[in-house]
Amino acid sequence: LGWEISLTTTAVLAMSSTISKLGWGSGAAPKLISTIVVVGLVVVAGIFGYDLIMRCQQVITIVTGVITVGFFILGWGHIDFDAIGRIPSGGLPAMLGCCFFVMTGFGLGWVNIAADYSRYLPRKSSNSGIVFWTTFGASIANVLLIFYGLLLAGSNAKLAENVGNDPIGAMASILPIWYLIPYTIVAVLGLMSGSIMDNYSNGLALLSFGVKLPRTAAAGLTAALTVAGVVYVTFFSDTFIGPFQGFLTTLGVPMAVWAGMFVTDVIVRKKDYSTPDLYDPNGRYGKWNVKSFVILAVGTILGWGLVVNTAANWLTWQGYLLFLIGGKDGSWASANLGVIVALLVGLFGALAFQRGDIAKQEADLPASETADAIEAK
């Protein structure tokens, strides 16, 4: 839900910025129109289901790639390597903070969506193939875009500041007018495609919790929450980057713990889960995994104590353990160490306390079939 709000807000800001630049409106009107259009399309596509989403994704991916190459070419003239060379080097805490923030945004922030993609993969898909192609496909665009964005931000301090308020609109400001419209359309569609998948995923998540709602109603409920978040960030927040950073660091910590436990489960568990037992409160897996909840709580408490976000006033309570490494004003405060600490707590906590439980669960289960065996059938 947080990612749906973030992506939808970015799309709304991009569209409203373009409307204003083209002289088609001013004040709150462009934001209001953009909110109605973007949220409406996200809701419609999310309600109609997976097939429509996949059709949208395929087309948007191809067109976005072409438009992005054009952006690289047209924006190259705005890169000033002399200005970049004059930027002083950052310290180790700043570098780690940047790395962990990117890790949270492009890795940990999306780990829970894996089920939505993997459940549509053929059973014959190999584990190594899934890991490699998912990692490669998810990383290559991010590496290129982040590197290019750093060059642009280092060349123009004003542009770097504007990106924090309106990421897509700021990037569009360096483009010629004739390229502005196709660039904005494709950027908005790309952001919306992620929001569409998130909206669909949110609806399924509600249903999996036992909420008695039709899938369309569940998608509509998450859309209403998205509208509330978009309206807050668009109309009442001074910047986009403040709430966005707050969202990533606050939710990234418990997600890191969960991801660590999940990785341990993948490493240690040698057999497939028993599907009937997963749906049986009295089955081999039980109704509650108390150890997992304890590990999650401990990792989250430690992680939140080692992150700080001065851009969001509602998160000033975080960082209560930073006094151990120089305080909230020290150089290590912005290192986002809480994220990696949370990940390690989840990983090693599960290794230490759940290995025996997994062995008991697998005691009388048949061996898992390999991808080759499944394909042979």
Predicted regions and their residues:
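Transmembrane helix-loop boundary segments of multi-pass membrane transporters
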Residues: 17-32, 50-61, 169-177, 182, ...
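Hydrophobic, small-residue-rich membrane helices and short re-entrant helix-turn-helix hairpins
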Residues: 48-61, 112-144, 159-170, 198-216, ...
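Hydrophobic, membrane-embedded alpha-helices of multi-pass small-molecule transporters
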Residues: 72-78, 88-152, 174-199, 259, ...
